[in-house]
UniProtKB/Swiss-Prot annotation:
The keyword Cytoplasm applies. The gene is ngdn. It comes from the Eukaryota. It comes from Xenopus tropicalis (Western clawed frog). Part of the small subunit (SSU) processome, composed of more than 70 proteins and the RNA chaperone small nucleolar RNA (snoRNA) U3. Residues 297-316 have a biased composition (Basic residues). This is Neuroguidin. One of its GO terms (cellular component) is nucleolus. Pfam families: Sas10_Utp3 (PF04000). The keyword Glycoprotein does not apply. Residues 143-172, 280-316 are annotated as: Disordered.
Length: 316
């Protein structure tokens, strides 16, 4: 094991190199700080509207370096630092600086943005604050002179003495809906009605029962509810879910109200016991398509009541 004196002799060259490097760095930092101080005092760098947080951080770092330099000077002179008040000040300053680090991280974006704006004179193109609502955009882009000219132009146009001047900003004119000729033929209409009848026939209870009878799949046992009621409940649940998720009330058309009334009436009446769905659209026959064609309401014309002219009764 080497003696303590030998260890100290081995560390002397490394210590000398560190002191030389430290001296060079201190010289550079001193020159840089003096240049900044001169610019601030001459008014080149205006620090009147600076951030108090950064000013406090700079003051704490300066105090920390002063106490640290004082302790290094005491140790270099061979004096003991035990009980030195500078140690307690260093611990206190280090604690405050550590507590300020989360705040520094939160303010980093705002500080960098302000520094960049002060250097370049404008914000970045991708800065999110460029897309925020700007109340200045609500102000009319026309100057008072242009507005006065437009008002005078309208007055002249009404009187007929002069033509209306063309303004740079044109008024918005909504597009007009042009009438379109209805080119639907009778054959296309019949084909559409037949397709609708096939769709209704495939969803009928008769086809569903035949499918369950001849299918090899296991029979699915449901509650004692009709197929049309199950379909109605499914549509009603979908409607409720849409209203609750979108926070909006859906209005029912007259056609939907009539269908709902018809479905509810089928469950409360016994007339539908012997009623079977029309599946002639699947077999090629001519089924009833009267229910698929929208009915045209006819106005009821009754006998007109004769209106007698009321007058004053003569007194005898």
């Amino acid at each position: 094991m080497a003696a303590p004196g030998e260890i100290i002799l081995e560390d002397v060259p490394a210590s000398v190199n560190l002191f030389r490097t430290l001296q060079d760095q201190v010289t550079k930092v001193t020159a840089h700080v003096q240049a900044l101080t001169q610019k601030v005092r001459s008014g080149i760098y205006n620090t009147d509207k600076g951030l108090s947080f950064l000013e406090l951080k700079d003051q704490l770092l300066l105090f920390y370096l002063q106490d640290l330099t004082h302790l290094m000077l005491e140790k270099t002179n061979g004096k003991s630092i035990k009980g030195n008040p500078g140690i307690l000040r260093l611990v206190e300053l280090r604690t405050v600086l550590e507590k300020m680090r989360p705040i520094d991280q939160k303010l980093k974006y705002q500080i960098d943005k302000l520094v960049r704006a002060s250097v370049t004179g404008s914000l970045g193109e991708n800065d999110p604050l460029r897309f925020k609502p700007n109340p200045q955009n609500l102000i009319s882009k026309l100057s008072e002179a242009d507005e006065g000219e437009s008002d005078s132009g309208e007055d002249c146009a009404e009187s007929g003495n002069a033509k209306k001047p063309q303004s740079k900003v044109k008024k918005y004119i909504p597009p007009r809906l042009a009438p379109v000729h209805y080119d639907d033929t009778e054959a296309e209409r019949e084909h559409r009605i037949i397709e609708r009848a096939k769709k209704l026939a495939l969803s009928s209870s008769t086809i569903r029962e035949l499918k369950e009878q001849y299918s090899d799949a296991p029979e699915e046992i449901r509650e004692g509810r009709a197929y049309h009621m199950m379909r109605h409940d499914k549509e009603e649940q979908h409607r409720i879910n849409h209203e609750e998720s979108m926070m909006v009330r859906l209005n029912m058309t007259r056609k939907e109200k009539a269908r709902k009334k018809r479905v509810l009436a089928m469950t409360s009446q016994l007339n539908s016991l012997t009623h079977f769905s029309d599946i002639s659209a699947l077999t090629g026959g001519e089924g009833r398509t009267d229910d698929l064609v929208p009915s045209v309401k006819k106005s009821r014309k009754g006998p007109k009541k004769s209106k007698k002219r009321k007058g004053f009764r003569k007194r005898h």
